[in-house]
Amino acid sequence: MAPKVVDRRNTMPQLQAKSLEMRTPQATKTAVLVIGGAEDKVHGREILRTFFGRAGASKAYITIIPSASREPAIIGGRYIRIFEEMGAEKVEILDIREREQCESSQVKASLEACSGVFLTGGDQLRLCGVLSDTPVMEIIRQRVRGGQLTLAGTSAGAAVMGHHMIAGGGSGETPNRSLVDMATGLGLIPEVIVDQHFHNRNRMGRLISAVAAHPDRLGIGIDEDTCAVFERDGWLQVLGKGSVTIVDPTELTHTNEPHVGANEPLTVHNLRLHILSYGDRFHLYQRTVLPAVHRISS
């Protein structure tokens, strides 16, 4: 069955009916926040406040993992100050730089007890190299799946969310195989391939290139100071100042990706594209889109 898609040109009665449907998906307490980088850390801090609230607000015990960064103490300290100012009950840094540290009973105990984990930006390959296939990652994965933990990742911390991960590449070019470097991510949301700093760095071409190589995955491009909040019921909702771009290959009919040279242009037929902004929703499994309630006239 083809997925249902909201056509914004629908008649008003249809839009009003969708308005009621929009109110149906209820946010569960915990969530996974995938942030496109450069989130507001000074003024309204909406995205960081949303993470703080989902992690327990004044009762939050937040653990910051700055393993992607070359300056983990500095970047971790910045987030500690932010969440302490918001009123978190406890905030700590787990400065994990080597895989052996993931065996530490103290580290594992912290992750079993905390209510929120924040993965900072930096280098996604460094982050995966430290955390993948470790007890630390297993604790995070199981607690997220069980609805016991709110997880956020920004920039590199967002890139690692899928099983197939964009490790690097170019920007602003015609889609081709050499435009994107792929690696294995942490698989927290295995159905997606995430790119970050998306429109800010002109990365549409490389996300399409990644999806052409893995047409069983959903491409998600997230702008700076923008967040895709993944709920446990399959819905994602957009927060922040930019947009979230969905590249959906569900109905893809043809790509030449397996047969062309690395620098030759790609052919990709029948991709579906959604551009979502504040309040819009998308269902990860049903491939359904719903507009923000505030955009529907009463």
From Swiss-Prot:
The keyword Translocase does not apply. NCBIfam families: cyanophycinase (TIGR02069). It is an enzyme of class 3 (hydrolase). CDD domains: GAT1_cyanophycinase (cd03145). The active site is at 155 (charge relay system), 173 (charge relay system), 197 (charge relay system). Gene3D superfamilies: 3.40.50.880. It catalyses: [L-4-(L-arginin-2-N-yl)aspartate](n) + H2O = [L-4-(L-arginin-2-N-yl)aspartate](n-1) + L-4-(L-arginin-2-N-yl)aspartate. PANTHER family: CYANOPHYCINASE. Keywords: Hydrolase, Protease, Serine protease. It comes from the Bacteria. Pfam families: Peptidase_S51. This is Cyanophycinase. The lineage of its organism: Bacteria, Bacillati, Cyanobacteriota, Cyanophyceae, Nostocales. Exopeptidase that catalyzes the hydrolytic cleavage of multi-L-arginyl-poly-L-aspartic acid (cyanophycin; a water-insoluble reserve polymer) into aspartate-arginine dipeptides. It comes from Nostoc sp. (strain PCC 7120 / SAG 25.82 / UTEX 2576). Disulfide bonds: none annotated. Belongs to the peptidase S51 family. One of its GO terms (biological process) is proteolysis. Its EC number is 3.4.15.6. One of its GO terms (molecular function) is serine-type peptidase activity.
